[in-house]
Amino acid sequence: MRFDLITLFPEFFHSPLQSGLIAKAIAKGLAEVHCTNPRDFTCDRHHKVDDEPYGGGAGMVLKPEPLAAALESLPVVTPRQVIYLSPQGEPMTQALFQDLATSVEQLVLVCGHYEGIDERVMTWIDREISLGDFVLTCGEIPALALLNGVLRLRPGTIGKEESHRCDSFSDGLLDYPHYTRPAEFRGLKVPEVLLSGNHGAIAAWRRQQQLERTRDRRPDLYQAWQAQQSDLDSH
């Protein structure tokens, strides 16, 4: 899968691309990640990429010419999506990651800055995606989150694909608690059911933990899950 990052700060990605899951996926040939800097497509000696907004107002706006030129310079691998990371976009979810991981072979991620990009650049954008209902100083942070979330769902990236099938949100619920050795740590014991070897009992315990956690910590998700179950039962 190919990822193209349109970014004013390619150095932001140097460490993440050289460590952990992303680096391993690149080394195995499962992913290509390329950074393209709009400054390289400017014509003035100061490599100016922003300007004051028409109509006045605070902040600066990214100019259309260097962004459009950067986007048009990229090779096209189909199917692909061009995504602008923006607080106005649809929120990132596990379902969104799963959809992108299975439906596209190229993701172009446009990292915004300042007050945003000139609206005319939206001609090149397929969709806007947001990390959440808050504002950050740059689009590189949500771009990295999106890259990581999608890439880990691609076949071969994670050793055991069962790992991501059991992730939080994969079935609309939060994850269950995890334990490892030792069986007792500073007086805190692993639940007996996990030591029993009874796979049916373990599965039931984990499901109950998922339900309780989701109900207590994310009642919005729990209500959505209940509604989904009601729909399934009615059919």
Swiss-Prot record:
Species per Swiss-Prot/TrEMBL record: Synechococcus elongatus (strain ATCC 33912 / PCC 7942 / FACHB-805) (Anacystis nidulans R2)
Record's subcellular location: Cytoplasm
Protein known as: tRNA (guanine-N(1)-)-methyltransferase
UniProt GO molecular function: tRNA (guanine(37)-N1)-methyltransferase activity
GO biological process annotation, one example: tRNA N1-guanine methylation
PANTHER family linked: TRNA (GUANINE-N(1)-)-METHYLTRANSFERASE
Annotated family: Belongs to the RNA methyltransferase TrmD family.
Chief location of this protein within or outside the cell: cytoplasm
Catalytic activity: guanosine(37) in tRNA + S-adenosyl-L-methionine = N(1)-methylguanosine(37) in tRNA + S-adenosyl-L-homocysteine + H(+)
Binding positions (S-adenosyl-L-methionine): 112, 131-136
Main EC class the enzyme belongs to: transferase
